Curated annotation (Swiss-Prot):
Name of the protein in its database record: Trigger factor
Disulfide bonding pattern of the chain: none
One GO cellular component term: cytoplasm
Catalytic activity: [protein]-peptidylproline (omega=180) = [protein]-peptidylproline (omega=0)
Entry keyword set: Cell cycle, Cell division, Chaperone, Cytoplasm, Isomerase, Rotamase
Length: 452
C-alpha cells in the first residue's frame, strides 16, 4: 500500500492512495478461505466447497467486500498516521477502473480528501464575565394566576329572577337544525348543545343573534359560512339555523380556596399557591438562562477567530436555507426578510451558518479539554422522552432510535452542548442583575438560529 500527501492547503488535505492488485488478491484468497467452510452449495457436502468454486460463484461479491475493507482501513491509517482530526466524513474519489480492479487486473487507486478540525486555543472559562438578568415572582402575579384558575373553574347555573334573557358570557343549552336553501346539510344538526355566547365557538354571527334570547324561545339564526371554511361544500354559502333555546345559564366564577385546590389534586390553597409560584419562577428561570446563554455565545463568538471547515459551513447553510425556502413557500418569512433579495438573504444566513459552526467547534473543544461526555443513561433518557411523545408507537420509536446512530447523534448534540454551557457557567464570573418582567421576557433582535 502506498500513501502520498498530494496537497495540504488550509484545512483541506488530499492523499493519493494505491493498493496493489496483488495485495487485493491476497486479501481475496484469505476471505474465500474464511467463508468456504461455512457455505452450503448444491452438489457438495457442507463445508467442503472447493475454494475455486467459491471464487467462481462469489468472487466479485467477495472482492467488493475486500475493497470496502481496504478503503476503511486506509482511511483510518491516514488519519491516525498523520494525527488528523477530521471535521467530517472523508471523501474517497477512485481514479482506477473499478471493473478492472474487481476483476483483479488493476491496482486500486484513489484520492482521499479530508477537511480537518482547525487548531485553536479556546477561551479560559474562568476569564469570562457575564451578567444574568433575573426577575423575582411577585405576590400580585401569583394572585393573578390563582384568579385565572378560579375563572377557568367557573360553573354555569340557570338564570333566575326577573330577567332570563341571555347575555354575553352566558351558556345556552340549545337544539338546532341548519339548512341551506331549505335543505338540511350534514353536520348541521344537534340537540343539547352547550354554547357560551362570545366564545367564538360557532361560525361568526351565530352567537350574536342569541343574545337576549330566553328559555323556550325559537330563534332563526341567519349566517354565512366563511369563504375559508374547512368544509368546502359549505364555504361561502348562506345558511339558516332553526334554534330552540332550552336553558340560559349565568356564569358563576369559582373561588381560589381549598376546595379549588382539592379539585386540582392538591391538599389546600397554600399548596396550590406554592405550586403556581414555583411554576412562574421556573418560567422566569428558563428565560434568564436563555438570555445568559445567548450572552455567553456572543462572548465565545467574538473571542474566537479561526478558519472554518468549508464543507461544515456549506452543510449548515444548506439546512438553514432549506428552512428559509420552506418558509418562503408558505408565506412565513418575517416581514423584514420578505423585502430582501435572495442574494441578501443568502449572505445573512451564510453568516448565521458560520456562527453556528464556529460556536459548535468552540463548545466541542472546551468540552473535550474538560472531559465532558454524554453518558449512556443520559442518551437513553432522551430517547425515552422522545419516544413517549408518540403514544402507542413509543416502543417502535424507541427501538428505531436504538438502531440508528444518526438519530442518536441528533439527540446527543444538544445534551452535550448544555453540559458544556453548564460547565462554563460554573467557572465564569456571573453577576446577577434584577430586571423587570418585560425586560426579561422581551425577545432578542437576532435572527432565529443566531445563537448557535
Amino acid at each position: 500500500m502506498q500513501i502520498v500527501e498530494k496537497s495540504g492547503e488550509g484545512l483541506s488535505r488530499v492523499f493519493g492512495v494505491t493498493v496493489p492488485a496483488s495485495e487485493l488478491a491476497t486479501r481475496l484468497e484469505a476471505r474465500i478461505a474464511e467463508v468456504a467452510p461455512q457455505m452450503n452449495v448444491k452438489g457438495f457436502r457442507p463445508g467442503k466447497v472447493p475454494t475455486a468454486h467459491v471464487r467462481r460463484l462469489y468472487g466479485k461479491a467477495l472482492m467488493g467486500e475486500v475493497i470496502e475493507q481496504a478503503l476503511n482501513e486506509t482511511t483510518t491509517k491516514v488519519l491516525e498516521d498523520n494525527k488528523l482530526r477530521p471535521a467530517g466524513q472523508p471523501e474517497l474519489n477512485p481514479s482506477s477502473d473499478m471493473d478492472k480492479v474487481i476483476a483483479g487486473g488493476e491496482d486500486l487507486s484513489f484520492d482521499l480528501a479530508v477537511e480537518v478540525m482547525p487548531e485553536f486555543e479556546p477561551i479560559d472559562p474562568t476569564s469570562i464575565e457575564l451578567v444574568k438578568p433575573v426577575y423575582k415572582v411577585s405576590d400580585e402575579e401569583v394572585q393573578e394566576a390563582l384568579d385565572e384558575l378560579a375563572k377557568q373553574a367557573r360553573t354555569y347555573e340557570p338564570r333566575t329572577g326577573k330577567s332570563l334573557k341571555a347575555k354575553d358570557g352566558d351558556q345556552l343549552l340549545i337544539d338546532f337544525v341548519g339548512t341551506i336553501d331549505g335543505v338540511e346539510f350534514a353536520g348541521g344538526k344537534a340537540e343539547g348543545a352547550e354554547l357560551v355566547l362570545g366564545s367564538g365557538q360557532f361560525i361568526p354571527g351565530f352567537e350574536d343573534q342569541l343574545v337576549g334570547a330566553k328559555p323556550g324561545d325559537d330563534v332563526v339564526v341567519k349566517v354565512k359560512f366563511p369563504e375559508e371554511y374547512q368544509a368546502k361544500d359549505l364555504a361561502g354559502k348562506d345558511a339558516e339555523f332553526a334554534t330552540k333555546v332550552q336553558e340560559v345559564r349565568a356564569p358563576v366564577d369559582g373561588k381560589a380556596d381549598d376546595e379549588l385546590a382539592k379539585r386540582l389534586g392538591l391538599s389546600d390553597l397554600a399548596a396550590l399557591t406554592e405550586l403556581l409560584k414555583s411554576n412562574l419562577a421556573g418560567r422566569y428561570d428558563n428565560s434568564s438562562r436563555f438570555k445568559l446563554k445567548r450572552a455567553l455565545l456572543d462572548v465565545l463568538d467574538t473571542k474566537h477567530d479561526f478558519p472554518l471547515p468549508p464543507r461544515m459551513v456549506d452543510a449548515e447553510f444548506a439546512g438553514i436555507w432549506q428552512q428559509v425556502e420552506a418558509d418562503k413557500a408558505r408565506g412565513g418569512l418575517p416581514p423584514e426578510d420578505a423585502e430582501k433579495t435572495e442574494d441578501q438573504l443568502k449572505d445573512e444566513y451564510k453568516k448565521i451558518a458560520e456562527r453556528r459552526v464556529r460556536l459548535g467547534l468552540v463548545l466541542a473543544e472546551i468540552g473535550r479539554k474538560n472531559d465532558v461526555v454524554v453518558t449512556d443513561q443520559e442518551l437513553t433518557d432522551a430517547i425515552m422522552r422522545e419516544a413517549r411523545q408518540y403514544g402507542a408507537q413509543a416502543q417502535q420509536v424507541f427501538d428505531m432510535y436504538r438502531q440508528r446512530a444518526d438519530l442518536q447523534a441528533a439527540l446527543r448534540a444538544p445534551i452535550y452542548e448544555d453540559k458544556v454551557v453548564d460547565l462554563i457557567f460554573g467557572k465564569a464570573k456571573i453577576e446577577e442583575k434584577e430586571v423587570s418582567k418585560d425586560e426579561l421576557l422581551e425577545e432578542d433582535d437576532l435572527p432565529e438560529g443566531y445563537g448557535g
